[in-house]
Amino acid sequence: MSEKLMTHTQWIQLCDNVVRACASQHSQRAYRASSSMYRAWVARTKLIFLSKATVLRYRDYLLLTKKLAPKSINLHLTVLRRLAQEGIAEQVLEPSTALAILRIPRVPNRGVRAGVWLPREQAQRIL
């Protein structure tokens, strides 16, 4: 099966569908920003809009060049996975391409503390 090339109009429609599916306004804003950032990066690099190789390069760009935290990168990957799913539904993306994108692993969050951590002295006082 040959790779389908997505038009700009199809990309915008996919992004709109994915953003509208979010219940929270905060999620909508984050998804919109993430898809816009990805689209701008793809335009600069002149790569295929949505392919496994492009998403992997983008993940590396976010990690190595932008130096984003794993949770931020994983948000971007989640948006791209949703776009891939929507691409199948709208028949603008080959199912094999979308499945390859869906199988891209999350960036591990090892060694990164989440939440508010108290210094040892304050924690002992509370206990």
What positions do the PLM features span?
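Short alpha-helical hairpin
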Residues: 3-15
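Alpha-helix N-cap/N′ positions at the starts of helices
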Residues: 10-11, 54, 118-121
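N-terminal core-binding DNA-recognition domain of tyrosine recombinases/integrases
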Residues: 12, 16-29, 35-113
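Long, amphipathic, Lys/Arg-enriched alpha-helical "connector/arm" segment
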Residues: 107-127
